[in-house]
């Protein structure tokens, strides 16, 4: 088996982190419903919020109302906000109407929003009451998608965390993959693990309620997304044990992630090499094509999705880029520690957001590529900076070997576009 790539320069695990608590510019956790409702095929997400919440979901999902999507919004009217109506009774009526019309729903999530949190609406009590009423056909859970103190990927974390306490108990030794991935990417991961003889493998979230995984003291789990800190804590409380590894972005990250699982399950070096050699070679070849554009280019990450640290590791080590600043909404060293170990010392690490101060640092650095939110991209482009929308990195399949070239290409394309525009202007 090929040995892991070693870092000559010291890593960033012990690098001082610049803490920022100023003005923020991010989407709220409701955004996670866009990919969760596609993954969980018999679940429904009922947001208790305002018309703004409804417009966000409708426009972001690109789903027509008549398509019967698996999400909706119970609108809080002025009388609800003023306390002139019993919001709990209103929720009961809406849920009863929904379930009578949609008997295919097996899991119902009551999702809190900024308005429901401001008026202290107890959705946990509503979920318990409604579960008693509609059990065993429907389980009702709740979580918050509010953007008051969170960023948009934390919606998935809150959703999965709400599921962990009600997962069935099991004594079986099983591998649990934690995090929502597109089906085609998840199938690739399961296929590689199956070829190594690793199993049984379960997934959280499961596509259907009847496939919900169990959890117990013999459960080991591997995390697919770096923003699932609270879900990991909930699994730890249930007795499960996490497999520590870098996240599976790029050839190196995917190999180290799979290697950690293989070692846990006693897979031989020969078997591991036989299973991974071909996809690793394809990944390296695909990355190399994009790396020609990215090599020796500088990059600046605004905090947005919590993917920033693993992506910076991938871009600096596999694509030859230089990171100036790597900002993340939250830095969970328990999860991204292995990626920090591989990220060579040098870039500023910042946690949280003070958007004006970060804009000043970005303008002073003049990076070749800036990864930021939608609201910052156009103004920075107007100032002559090349940008990449951070949210695209969440909605695009980017995990594991077969997507490694696509991941590198996402960063190469805006640089190529800028270079082409400069050539056209020069002509």
Curated annotation (Swiss-Prot):
NCBIfam families hit by this protein: DPOR_bchN, PRK02842.1
GO biological process terms held by the UniProt record: light-independent bacteriochlorophyll biosynthetic process; photosynthesis, dark reaction
EC number, as in UniProt: 1.3.7.7
This protein's pathway: Porphyrin-containing compound metabolism; bacteriochlorophyll biosynthesis (light-independent)
UniProt source species: Dinoroseobacter shibae (strain DSM 16493 / NCIMB 14021 / DFL 12)
Purpose of the protein: Component of the dark-operative protochlorophyllide reductase (DPOR) that uses Mg-ATP and reduced ferredoxin to reduce ring D of protochlorophyllide (Pchlide) to form chlorophyllide a (Chlide). This reaction is light-independent. The NB-protein (BchN-BchB) is the catalytic component of the complex.
Transmembrane segments: none
Pfam families on file: Oxidored_nitro
Cofactor-binding details, from the entry: Binds 1 [4Fe-4S] cluster per heterodimer. The cluster is bound at the heterodimer interface by residues from both subunits.
GO molecular function, one term: oxidoreductase activity, acting on the CH-CH group of donors, iron-sulfur protein as acceptor
Catalysis: reaction(s): chlorophyllide a + oxidized 2[4Fe-4S]-[ferredoxin] + 2 ADP + 2 phosphate = protochlorophyllide a + reduced 2[4Fe-4S]-[ferredoxin] + 2 ATP + 2 H2O
Keywords annotated in UniProt: 4Fe-4S, ATP-binding, Bacteriochlorophyll biosynthesis, Chlorophyll biosynthesis, Iron, Iron-sulfur, Metal-binding, Nucleotide-binding, Oxidoreductase, Photosynthesis
The protein's name: Light-independent protochlorophyllide reductase subunit N
Domain of life: Bacteria
Cofactor(s) required, per the database record: [4Fe-4S] cluster
Main EC class the enzyme belongs to: oxidoreductase
Residue sites binding [4Fe-4S] cluster per the record: 28, 53, 114
Record PANTHER family: LIGHT-INDEPENDENT PROTOCHLOROPHYLLIDE REDUCTASE SUBUNIT N
Protein family according to the UniProt entry: Belongs to the BchN/ChlN family.
Annotated InterPro entries: LIPOR_BchN/ChlN (IPR050293), Nase/OxRdtase_comp1 (IPR000510), Protochl_reductN (IPR005970)
Assembly notes: Protochlorophyllide reductase is composed of three subunits; BchL, BchN and BchB. Forms a heterotetramer of two BchB and two BchN subunits.
């Amino acid at each position: 088996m090929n040995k892991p790539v070693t870092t000559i320069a010291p890593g960033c695990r012990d690098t001082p982190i610049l803490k920022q608590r100023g003005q923020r510019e991010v989407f709220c956790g409701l955004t996670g419903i866009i990919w969760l409702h596609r993954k969980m095929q018999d679940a429904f997400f009922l947001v208790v919020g305002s018309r703004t919440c409804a417009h966000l979901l409708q426009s972001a999902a690109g789903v027509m109302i008549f398509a019967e999507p698996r999400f909706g919004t119970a609108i809080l009217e002025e009388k609800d906000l003023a306390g002139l109506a019993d919001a709990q009774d209103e929720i009961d009526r809406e849920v009863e109407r929904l379930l009578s019309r949609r008997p295919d729903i097996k899991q119902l999530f009551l999702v809190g929003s900024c308005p429901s949190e401001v008026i202290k609406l107890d959705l946990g009590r509503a979920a318990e009451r409604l579960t008693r009423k509609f059990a065993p056909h429907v389980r009702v859970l709740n979580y918050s998608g509010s953007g008051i103190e969170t960023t948009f990927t934390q919606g998935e974390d809150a959703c999965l965390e709400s599921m962990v306490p009600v997962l069935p108990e099991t004594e079986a030794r099983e591998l649990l993959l934690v995090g929502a991935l597109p089906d085609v990417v998840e199938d690739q991961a399961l296929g590689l693990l199956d070829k190594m003889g690793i199993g049984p493998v379960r997934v959280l979230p499961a596509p259907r309620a009847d496939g919900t995984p169990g959890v117990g003291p013999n459960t080991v789990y591997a995390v697919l997304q770096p923003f699932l800190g609270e879900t990991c804590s909930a699994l730890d409380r249930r007795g499960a044990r996490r497999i520590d590894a870098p996240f599976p972005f790029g050839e190196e990250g995917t190999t180290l992630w799979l290697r950690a699982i293989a070692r846990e399950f006693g897979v031989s070096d020969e078997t591991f090499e036989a299973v991974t050699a071909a996809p690793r070679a394809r990944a390296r070849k695909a990355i190399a094509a994009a790396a020609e554009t990215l090599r020796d280019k500088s990059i600046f990450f605004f905090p947005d999705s919590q993917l920033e640290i693993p992506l910076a590791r991938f871009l600096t080590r596999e694509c030859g880029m230089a990171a100036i600043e790597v900002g993340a909404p939250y830095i969970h060293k328990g999860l991204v520690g292995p990626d920090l170990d591989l990220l060579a010392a040098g870039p500023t690490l910042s946690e949280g957001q003070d958007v004006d101060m970060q804009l000043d640092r970005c303008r002073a650095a003049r990076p070749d590529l800036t990864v930021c939110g939608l609201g910052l991209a156009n103004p920075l482009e107007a100032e002559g900076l090349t940008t990449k929308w951070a949210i695209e990195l969440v909605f695009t399949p980017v995990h594991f070997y077969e997507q490694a070239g696509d991941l590198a290409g996402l960063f190469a394309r805006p640089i190529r576009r800028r270079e082409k525009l400069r050539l056209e202007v020069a002509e």
